Amino acid sequence: MVNLVIVSHSARLGEGVGELARQMLMNDGCKLAIAAGIDDPASPIGTDPIKVMEAIESVADADHILVMMDIGSALLSAETALDLLDPAIAAKVRLCAAPLVEGTLAATVSAAAGAGIDKVIEDAMNALEAKRVQLGLPSQPQHASLTAAPVDDRDARSVSVVIQNHNGLHVRPASKLVAALAGFNADLVLEKGGKCVTPDSLNQIALLQVRRNDTLRLLARGPDADAALAAFQALAAENFGEPTEAAPARRPASADRVEGKVVLYPQPQDRISRETSAAIGQQQLRLKRAIDRTLEDLSALTTLAEATFSADIAAIFSGHHTLLDDPDLYAAACDIIRDEQCSAAWAWQQVLSDLSQQYRHLDDAYLQARYIDIEDILHRTLRHLNERNEALPQFSAPSILVADDIFPSTVLQLNAEQVKGICLQAGSELSHGAIIARQAGIAMLCQQSDALTLQDGENVILDIPGKRVIRG
């Protein structure tokens, strides 16, 4: 837990920043204290080391206390306060150079979400980036702790492994890596080809595009460094829970030709218009609750997938769970809600649509196909935000489901006795939906440009080897 102290020359400014920051709080995950101005009615502008010391002591029931300051003597007063404090409390205190207003707001969101002190400081130091982008200014180098650049071997121990997974370190094995390295008391960095990310973010790992035969290095420093490296090495030896070779595709018995009546399945439309909302805390709370309900859905889908198919299929949805349970996503949406005073739905759409586009633009076809997983998660969260129920169409055997694209969670819920095939105008044979369809014994054709010209109830044949649809 990280608590914050706001130090300002002006009592009004300090209270105002505190008022803004409290709008970010949805729980008791972060306490705020204010030490602003001096007790001199004739000359109230200034800072008082005793006030700073007392403010720090009032929130000292945390692992760390981060002190945010405005200018000049605020820093001197904070440093003097450290000398006055009990050494045990002073050891918890960090002074932050971030801008007072933007930095305090970003730090509050990060601390309230449960981030550690280094991440809270990093977010505070990067707080001006959104404003720079909006003003068309070039981005500044990101302030980060261990992730800013490759860690010197002299500063950390490391282990390198060669990835043997057939499809590289995609979402499912990456989620196992996140889980395996969570909880170690160590600073950890994953490095591939000079690019570094922290292993607590599934999205960052996926965007590294770690392919088969790539070398991946984990660097660690801290009390649990050796244990973390051993866990990484052990997981790599097990190929991150996957076979080294791709499992043979399981096809339906009549895979070469499947016939049925068309059932058009319109892709759910989730485009959210921007809505203004000054209730920042309320919108952030709505989003948190929708994410929590979506995480519950994904746990249920994981259980269903394991009961219906296999642990491999279940790992798709446990991977979705890990991907969604990334505090950086929620923090980014909270920043948008705060900075743009918009609805939770619009902010969440911006964050996940941007992530989906990042996947679409990867040059690894297997990872590129994961864009639909992000959109599946986005759709499910927006359903909860808007309190909207949704049901699959009614199918009568034999049917051919026709759509622009299809979510993995939709394919999971199809009955293979009724749905004999899926025909998509877009889609990918490498998608998780296609993997589930193969295990279910449902034929699938993707990239059929004329798919949406088919009519409901029309009889069609899917020619799988020829990758074409035969009408009539």
From Swiss-Prot:
<dbReference type="InterPro" id="IPR039643">
    <property type="entry name" value="DhaM"/>
</dbReference>
<keyword id="KW-0808">Transferase</keyword>
<dbReference type="InterPro" id="IPR004701">
    <property type="entry name" value="PTS_EIIA_man-typ"/>
</dbReference>
<feature type="active site" description="Pros-phosphohistidine intermediate">
    <location>
        <position position="170"/>
    </location>
</feature>
<dbReference type="InterPro" id="IPR000032">
    <property type="entry name" value="HPr-like"/>
</dbReference>
<feature type="domain" description="PTS EIIA type-4">
    <location>
        <begin position="1"/>
        <end position="135"/>
    </location>
</feature>
<dbReference type="GO" id="GO:0019563">
    <property type="term" value="P:glycerol catabolic process"/>
</dbReference>
<dbReference type="InterPro" id="IPR036637">
    <property type="entry name" value="Phosphohistidine_dom_sf"/>
</dbReference>
<dbReference type="GO" id="GO:0009401">
    <property type="term" value="P:phosphoenolpyruvate-dependent sugar phosphotransferase system"/>
</dbReference>
<comment type="function">
    <text>Component of the dihydroxyacetone kinase complex, which is responsible for the phosphoenolpyruvate (PEP)-dependent phosphorylation of dihydroxyacetone. DhaM serves as the phosphoryl donor. Is phosphorylated by phosphoenolpyruvate in an EI- and HPr-dependent reaction, and a phosphorelay system on histidine residues finally leads to phosphoryl transfer to DhaL and dihydroxyacetone.</text>
</comment>
<dbReference type="Pfam" id="PF05524">
    <property type="entry name" value="PEP-utilisers_N"/>
</dbReference>
<dbReference type="Pfam" id="PF03610">
    <property type="entry name" value="EIIA-man"/>
</dbReference>
<dbReference type="InterPro" id="IPR036618">
    <property type="entry name" value="PtsI_HPr-bd_sf"/>
</dbReference>
<dbReference type="GO" id="GO:0016020">
    <property type="term" value="C:membrane"/>
</dbReference>
<feature type="domain" description="HPr">
    <location>
        <begin position="156"/>
        <end position="243"/>
    </location>
</feature>
<dbReference type="GO" id="GO:0047324">
    <property type="term" value="F:phosphoenolpyruvate-glycerone phosphotransferase activity"/>
</dbReference>
<dbReference type="InterPro" id="IPR035895">
    <property type="entry name" value="HPr-like_sf"/>
</dbReference>
<dbReference type="Pfam" id="PF00391">
    <property type="entry name" value="PEP-utilizers"/>
</dbReference>
<dbReference type="InterPro" id="IPR008279">
    <property type="entry name" value="PEP-util_enz_mobile_dom"/>
</dbReference>
<comment type="similarity">
    <text>Belongs to the PEP-utilizing enzyme family.</text>
</comment>
<feature type="active site" description="Tele-phosphohistidine intermediate">
    <location>
        <position position="9"/>
    </location>
</feature>
<dbReference type="InterPro" id="IPR012844">
    <property type="entry name" value="DhaM_N"/>
</dbReference>
<feature type="region of interest" description="PTS EI-like, N-terminal part">
    <location>
        <begin position="266"/>
        <end position="472"/>
    </location>
</feature>
<dbReference type="Pfam" id="PF00381">
    <property type="entry name" value="PTS-HPr"/>
</dbReference>
<feature type="active site" description="Tele-phosphohistidine intermediate">
    <location>
        <position position="432"/>
    </location>
</feature>
<dbReference type="InterPro" id="IPR036662">
    <property type="entry name" value="PTS_EIIA_man-typ_sf"/>
</dbReference>
<dbReference type="InterPro" id="IPR008731">
    <property type="entry name" value="PTS_EIN"/>
</dbReference>
<comment type="subunit">
    <text>Homodimer. The dihydroxyacetone kinase complex is composed of a homodimer of DhaM, a homodimer of DhaK and the subunit DhaL.</text>
</comment>
<protein>
    <recommendedName>
        <fullName>PEP-dependent dihydroxyacetone kinase, phosphoryl donor subunit DhaM</fullName>
        <ecNumber>2.7.1.121</ecNumber>
    </recommendedName>
</protein>
<dbReference type="InterPro" id="IPR001020">
    <property type="entry name" value="PTS_HPr_His_P_site"/>
</dbReference>
